[in-house]
Amino acid sequence: MAPDTHPGQSASANVYDAVEYPGFAYAHTHPDQLAVMALLYGLDPPPVETCRVLEVACNEGANLIPMAYTIPGAKFVGFDIAPECVARGQEHINALGLKNIRLFAADMLNVGPELGQFDYIIAHGLYAWVPEPVRDRALALCGELLKPNGVAFVSYNALPGSHLRQM
């Protein structure tokens, strides 16, 4: 059985497309927030106005699209293993006429340096529910793709707070 499928599902089908996972904009992942946190810890973060941001497992881009809309001088890249989610996100990007954002479908285990380097890398939520090889790869991508003064945001959803969004 392919790692992205469940019993009874074909290898070409993707469980992340089969079960809808709604996306949201998360203010605490915004480059403005990440830059301020970095400053508070004595770091010298990259300027937000011209930053390059990667979101790992971006779903349909609901977190990245508002950032791209409000920071036109920055560049945004997101990928997700679910092609249908990425396609929905691309429809929103096209409708808004955004030119500073790119979404694509990819397995995290198969991406790397070809993406370039980033000032900010976001891996929100996924770390809590993906298998160990994917968690390891998420951290490795931060090491490979983060610029020297870059900031990585890796969150871990834990009970009981992680179920608040279901209320």
Model-derived regions: residue spans:
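A short acidic, Gly/Pro-enriched loop at the edge of an enzyme's catalytic core
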Residues: 112-121
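Conserved class I S-adenosyl-L-methionine
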Residues: 151-167
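Conserved alpha-helix/loop element of class I SAM-dependent methyltransferases that forms part
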Residues: 18, 22-51, 66
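A short glycine-rich, Lys/Arg-flanked "PGG" loop and its adjoining helix->strand segment in the class I
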Residues: 136-148
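Conserved SAM-binding motif I beta-strand of class I
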Residues: 75-80
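Conserved SAM/SAH-binding beta-strand->alpha-helix loop
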Residues: 82-84
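Conserved SAM-binding loop of SAM-dependent methyltransferases across substrates and taxa
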Residues: 60-73
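Conserved SAM-binding strand-loop segment of SAM-dependent methyltransferases
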Residues: 97-108
